[in-house]
Curated annotation (Swiss-Prot):
Binding site residues for substrate: 88, 180, 210, 296
GO biological process: S-adenosylmethionine biosynthetic process
Gene name in the database record: dadD
Keyword presence, Hydrolase: yes
Subunit structure, interactors included: Homotetramer.
Lineage: Archaea, Methanobacteriati, Methanobacteriota, Methanomada group, Methanococci
Function comment: Catalyzes the deamination of three SAM-derived enzymatic products, namely 5'-deoxyadenosine, S-adenosyl-L-homocysteine, and 5'-methylthioadenosine, to produce the inosine analogs. Can also deaminate adenosine. The preferred substrate for this enzyme is 5'-deoxyadenosine, but all these substrates are efficiently deaminated. Likely functions in a S-adenosyl-L-methionine (SAM) recycling pathway from S-adenosyl-L-homocysteine (SAH) produced from SAM-dependent methylation reactions.
Keywords annotated in UniProt: Hydrolase, Metal-binding, Zinc
Cofactor: Zn(2+)
Organism: Methanococcus aeolicus (strain ATCC BAA-1280 / DSM 17508 / OCM 812 / Nankai-3)
Family of the protein in this entry: Belongs to the metallo-dependent hydrolases superfamily. MTA/SAH deaminase family.
Disulphide bridges, residue numbers: none
Name under which the protein is recorded: 5'-deoxyadenosine deaminase
Binding site for Zn(2+): 59, 61, 207, 296
Amino acid sequence: MILIQDATINNKVQDILIEKNKIKKIGKNLIQKENLNRKDLKIIDGKNKIIIPGLVNTHTHTPMTLFRGVADDLPLMDWLNNYIWKMEANLNEKIVYDATMLGCMEMIKSGTTTFNDMYFYMNGIIKGVQETGIRAYLGYGMIDLFDEEKRENELKETVNTVENIQKLNNPKINPTVSPHAPYTCSMELLQESHNLAKKYNVPLHIHLNETIDEIKTVEEMTNKRPFEYLDSFGFFNGVKVISAHNVHLSNKEIEIIKNKNIAISHNPISNLKLASGIAPIPKLMENTVLITLGTDGCGSNNNLNLFEEIKMASLIHKGNSLNPTVVSASQSFEFATKNGANALGLNAGELVEGALADVVIIDINKPYLIPNENIYSHLVYSFNGVVDMVIIDGEIVLNNGKMVNINEEKVYENAEKSYNKLLNNSDE
């Protein structure tokens, strides 16, 4: 049991009581009101601290931490075909594990408590997630390139991943079904992905409408835009869908997104860095679409700090629309907390009694957070993402900025070694 006293919580100075993996009580003077005379009670001084819900990163590729800075300033297809996919061919489970450890640490240290990931060498990712204590939604990223034999192998990998994760019976690790995109996946793979998501009652996670060229490719193959094509065979029906990017959308596609309750993962920094464009978030908001935030992978961002996405998501749409009132600080903050949790069906993202105890504690005695009067504005527009403490599922995983159960230096050392192996193999 954890009691944090006299912290700023939901704009008030009060206490928060965590029991097991839930927020039990929020209020003043809880130590007296709750008769907290227990040996297992850990009391934390919350003075000069603000407590916020843990951030939810709804689209990333965590092991791509080792791709940070290796292929900058390139268009998407050049970036993928000539750099990323060539390097990925040299990955193995150990490299992916080392990269995942680094990525999970980076997310935790910048206040992310849950992430939604699509990649491969899933055992390495699962191991890293378990050791760091972060909450994760994990999918094997399927690409069949319209080849029947490869399709069967990809689907088999997904079934194995889903069933292996479910067998863990770990509430912090959840499976998804994750076909890469319509331009890399056959209709048969996409249809079977939908069937598997329904069968196992897990979310679908996919990239859609990231670039104009990608949309043209799908139109040439199907005579339809991506959302129209997927909707034509029921891909969105009866399942929870998280769609990443959604940069270039027709009015008809926005109608499909709205009517099918598709959750949008907005990745503004990656979209800007790859010059993919700017997603029409204000228009989607007008249509009551659920907007969430993702970082994408470190190869195209180049970090996993969701506070940077929160700031960018608010600023870019003001500048793009010439309207300073669109995407307010509070709305952008909700994208990364409440909305992200809702998209994944997670009882988190808000500091309310009964919610999962995924919380972040930030020291507000910092020059860039003073004066404290408009602290939530500061968290969006002036905070650097360095947090003091992180609690996930009721367990402290970061204390005073340091990982509790992880040797940080060893993680850095192993990541450097794996990067050198990856780079040397790629050069051969």
